[in-house]
Amino acid sequence: MKLLFGCSDWMAAWVRARIPFMDPEGFGPCQAIGVADGQGRIVGGVVFHGWNHHYRSIEVSCAADSAKWLSRNTIRGILSYPFEQLGVVRMSSVTRPDDDRTRHVLEALGFTYEGTGRKVFGDADGVSYSLLRDEWREGRFGPAQMEGKLSHG
């Protein structure tokens, strides 16, 4: 898999088209990363939006056409971008309570369930997750894991 940078508008539209409960107006100002397979086909995308400069927080949304788009190295590249390049201290994501696949992915990536917001998506509730920079740094996909692997062979 290959990460694609510099295609934020196009990639944000690609992701938005695959999220059935997405606001039709889109993400607003954002940065996006595409994920291409070995043949160069887009198989997934991640959009960082809702940037709060004062509190250094950002929201993340993602979509995929393949269940195999998240390799360990792809995950590291995607998660390092907001924390290392944008300098955020908190990344959040909101999805529907019945979106078990997304909830499972968020939890596997180290995000913490924060609660349920009522009628976040019009008539549907939303469940909130977050990942803090320190949690990412020490987690399965953070730099502490890479440093440990490099120092142990």
For every predicted segment, state its role.
Residues 93-103, 120-121:
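Conserved beta-strand-loop-alpha-helix junction that forms the acyl-donor binding cleft
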Residues 84-95:
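Conserved GNAT acetyl-CoA-binding A-motif
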Residues 112-127:
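Conserved catalytic-core motifs of GNAT/GCN5-like acyltransferases
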Residues 54-66, 94:
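Conserved acetyl-CoA binding element of GNAT-fold acetyltransferases
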Residues 6-55:
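Acetyl-CoA-dependent GNAT
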Residues 65-76:
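Conserved glycine-rich acetyl-CoA-binding loop
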Residues 98-115:
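Conserved active-site alpha-helix within GNAT-family acetyltransferase domains
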Residues 1-10, 135-153:
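Conserved N-terminal entry element of GNAT/NAT acetyltransferase domains
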